[in-house]
Amino acid sequence: MAPAPDPAPAGSAAPDPASAPQGLPAASLLQLIWLASPALPVGGFSYSEGLEIAVECAGVTNESAAAAWLQEQLMLTQARGDLAVVHQALAAWRAGDAERVRALNDWVLHTRETSELRLQTEQMGRSLADWLRNQHAGDAEALSDVARLAALPPTYPVAFALAAARTQARAEDVLLACAFGWAENMVQAAIKAVPLGQSAGQRILARLAAAIPGAVAHAMQLGEAERQAFSPMLAVLSARHETQYSRLFRS
């Protein structure tokens, strides 16, 4: 006979699962997992966002350097820029504010300082719009939003915000999913470009995952005039990548 479980300590009550905070509805949680998945057909795997040229020119040649470089990019380009756009665009889509959506999309385009970085956000935005069109076939209201997105032309942060807008997810959860999806793609790029083993990649991903909540919190408190995309060395690296002799990635 199995031993009886130990009794709860005197003066304490066993936790009641029914009283625990309720999480996301299953459908919304699965949608966020789907959006963060590297299997989402938007082509994120084909971009390194400057990491490939950093391996050649900026000393990113081992696990420690790759982890530090990616963590800097998380804080410099994602937390201060793209994640803040996702946060603000999510609110705009849910409010039906088309002018605000357009302004945020234009801001993303203006912050891409090289042709390959601009092509990346445009290509991934178009691909996500195509995916949304297929997902919402037969839903006139959703397709109307997708048509507005496709007409911009869309950037990836604004398209991601629309993809999440029709879920019941909180803004924080949407940004966590977006950031983790970015981290997974970048770790896979590091594994190929440095190169690194799978275990090293998982250690880097663990470091990024630990930093993501702070990056999301920072992005969510930024106002309209506080977003920024000041990362001049990334622009220099990206420009050099355009003429790099041998490349695996498109950025």
UniProtKB/Swiss-Prot annotation:
Gene3D superfamilies referenced in this protein's UniProt entry, alphabetically: Urease accessory protein UreF
Pfam family, one: UreF
Species of the source: Paracidovorax citrulli (strain AAC00-1)
Major localisation: cytoplasm
The UniProt record lists the keyword Cytoplasm: yes
Record's function text: Required for maturation of urease via the functional incorporation of the urease nickel metallocenter.
Gene assigned in the entry: ureF
Biased composition regions of type Low complexity, renumbered to the chain: 9-20
Assigned protein family: Belongs to the UreF family.
Protein's name in the database: Urease accessory protein UreF
GO-annotated molecular function: nickel cation binding
Localization in the cell: Cytoplasm
